[in-house]
């Protein structure tokens, strides 16, 4: 039992997760720090992702972000309204800290993931699927072009973690 506790503490300190992510295998890349980065998404330097499809964009925090936060115990989400690129729209509380979540794009919120109220841990276990935060109708789709692709974001995370 002591060995299991030591291994768990070491994994937490190193930011290593053993949570199964095999369902993500077809379109992912792994950075040196073992964060999952999906192809086909756009990424902000503040560690949020955007999946744009049709007239709606889905927004959440990245695997890299949740790994640095630790176990998320509470998520405060907006009830609706507008979001502005680079401005906070939500906050998440983990065992380590409370952090603002910035919107990578501007627009009108059309849906909020209410599952996160009862299950904030979805931000840890499924940040790109069940742990999405809001869906937004973008007001300025050109903002998506200023965000990073998967390769750029992976490199960004590696450089950030090296410092």
Curated annotation (Swiss-Prot):
Keyword Mitochondrion: yes or no? Answer: yes
- Give the protein's cofactors: (R)-lipoate
The entry's protein name is: Glycine cleavage system H protein, mitochondrial
Do you know which Gene3D superfamilies this protein is assigned to? 2.40.50.100
InterPro entries per record: 2-oxoA_DH_lipoyl-BS, Biotin_lipoyl, GCV_H, GCV_H/Fam206, GCV_H_sub, Single_hybrid_motif
Family annotation (PROSITE patterns): BIOTINYL_LIPOYL (PS50968), LIPOYL (PS00189)
Q: Which Pfam families match?
A: GCV_H
Family, as annotated:
Belongs to the GcvH family.
List the CDD domains. GCS_H
The protein's job, in short, is:
The glycine cleavage system catalyzes the degradation of glycine. The H protein shuttles the methylamine group of glycine from the P protein to the T protein.
Q: What is its main location?
A: mitochondrion
What's a GO biological-process term for it? glycine decarboxylation via glycine cleavage system
Quote the cellular component terms of the Gene Ontology held in the record: glycine cleavage complex; mitochondrion
Subunit structure comment from the entry: The glycine cleavage system is composed of four proteins: P, T, L and H.
Domain Lipoyl-binding as annotated: residue spans: 56-137
Which lineage do the record's taxonomy fields give for this organism? Eukaryota, Viridiplantae, Streptophyta, Embryophyta, Tracheophyta
User: Could you tell me where this protein is found in the cell?
Assistant: Mitochondrion
Query: What are the UniProt keywords, alphabetically?
Result: Lipoyl, Mitochondrion, Transit peptide
Q: Where is the transit peptide?
A: 1-34
Give the cofactor note: Binds 1 lipoyl cofactor covalently.
N6-lipoyllysine modification sites are 96
Record the organism: Mesembryanthemum crystallinum (Common ice plant)
């Amino acid at each position: 039992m002591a060995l299991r506790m030591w291994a768990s503490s070491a994994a937490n300190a190193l930011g290593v997760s053993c949570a199964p992510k095999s369902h993500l295998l077809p379109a992912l890349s792994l950075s040196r720090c073992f964060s999952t980065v999906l192809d086909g998404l756009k990424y902000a330097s503040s560690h949020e992702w955007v999946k744009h499809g049709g007239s709606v964009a889905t927004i959440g925090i990245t695997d890299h972000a949740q790994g640095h936060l630790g176990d998320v115990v509470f998520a405060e989400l907006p009830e609706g309204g507008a979001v502005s690129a680079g401005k906070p729209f939500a906050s998440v509380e983990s065992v380590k800290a409370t952090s603002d979540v910035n919107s990578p794009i501007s627009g009108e919120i059309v849906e909020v993931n209410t599952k996160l109220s009862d299950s904030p841990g979805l931000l840890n276990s499924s940040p790109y699927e069940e742990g999405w935060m809001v869906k937004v109708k973008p007001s300025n789709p050109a903002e998506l072009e200023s965000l990073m692709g998967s390769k750029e974001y992976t490199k960004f995370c590696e450089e950030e973690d090296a410092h």
